[in-house]
Amino acid sequence: CLPLLWPPAVAPPPGGFWFTLLDAGQGLAAVVRTQHHVLVYDTGPKLGTTLDAGRAVLAPFLRQQGASRVDTLIVSHADIQHTSGVRSLRELMPVARILTSSPEQTPIDGAEACRAGQGWEWDGVRFQILHPPPAGFSDDNASCVLKVEGAAGRALLPGDIETAAETALTATYGTGLAAEILIAPHHGHRNLSTPAFLNAVQPRYVLFSTGYRNRFGYPRPETVARYQATGATLLNASDEGALTFRLEPGQALEPERYRREYRHYWTAP
């Protein structure tokens, strides 16, 4: 469901941020907006033979939100479900900085390596790269893991990390992983989201980014059961459309669900 008719926004207050997980098919595309800055985390998959999520989903959403540029683009790792919209997004608006886990494997001009320990602050909101370290991980386990923390809450974006990276993150950060909003690692793969990892994160909301009736069976039932056991609320963008959280002081943490808020007859169940 494309967010073309979403009502125009103003901007978060200082210390607040808006987090949106887009409905981008079997892949991932998310946007974090602070008062004066925009971050994009992954650019989604191809959508057929001639279209991709960068052109069809990300750019329209950003323009509707009043964004004229992307301050930082994080490409979590070299996987076409996460990278396919990069070129289109860069054609349609300026992108000031690009971080990715393996620049040598992701042919994106000007991309820099994301590494644990990197961080910055925009408008009172803290951005931290928690993973990967300089060596020891590859492929999905080398995904850039981003934590965003503002005055009203936190979001954890782990890309496609697998068990080895989950274990390392839990050992390194412990409860420092805590976040109200968690994007399920690797779309809800069956071997992920161990009890130790979930105990560290303690999410209130777990978000899945999967294709409708995808061939992988994501999210896997056994993984869903582990999340349900934590008491978290589980939401899937393929069911709900774009999911937006406005993390602002004094506001309840509740998702805006595109298909529920802006229902049309063609999106009715």
Q: Where do the protein language model's features map onto the residues?
A:
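Non-globular, low-confidence helical/coil segments that flank catalytic cores
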Residues: 1-269
